[in-house]
Amino acid sequence: MSRIGKRPIPVPAGVTVAIDGSAVTVKGPKGELSRVLPADIVVSQEGAELLVKRPSDEERHKALHGLTRTLVANMVEGVTTGFKRVLEITGVGYKAEIKPYGALLSLGFSHQIEYKAPQGVQITAPNPTTVVIEGASKEHVGQVAAEIRSLRKPEPYKGKGVKYQGEVVRRKAGKAGGK
């Protein structure tokens, strides 16, 4: 039995779960998420808990068991509390500005970059050097954060660029510069 897969998923009050074959839809205060799960894995609701079961101990079923349980648990957590990633922008003149369509980023290029936020993801900037990405889907929040970070990754000499909050950028010494 998978250590992760066998744990039941608690369903908080105010969250409804609809299971239709291999499709699971979770509705809550932060929105609605749907996902088609692997056909072999069975998700069932018993009271205020969801249980994930696998048909056999085949290697493939073992691998999908824990994955499916975590995907469903992330859906439940997403519609109740949501997910959040914080990006920090470092560098002279590097900044973020929030527009109705998403974010306008100045990252040291000759032009500003317009980043359009996908549906279900909100981008805010409490100050010009911090970008907060929030949403119900952990996958989408992480993907948006990774895409914005990839526009200008932190470089190792001065540390300029976009990094995750708490990320440690390994620094390098510059050239010796002697005669």
From Swiss-Prot:
Entry keyword Ribosomal protein: yes
Entries under PROSITE patterns matching the protein: RIBOSOMAL_L6_1
According to its record, what are the GO cellular component terms? cytosolic large ribosomal subunit
Keyword Chaperone tagged: no
What are the entry keywords?
Ribonucleoprotein, Ribosomal protein, RNA-binding, rRNA-binding
| GO annotation, biological process | cytoplasmic translation
Report the family membership. Answer: Belongs to the universal ribosomal protein uL6 family.
Quaternary form?
Answer: Part of the 50S ribosomal subunit.
User: Protein name, please?
Assistant: Large ribosomal subunit protein uL6
Please spell out the taxonomic lineage of the organism that makes this protein: Bacteria, Pseudomonadati, Gemmatimonadota, Gemmatimonadia, Gemmatimonadales
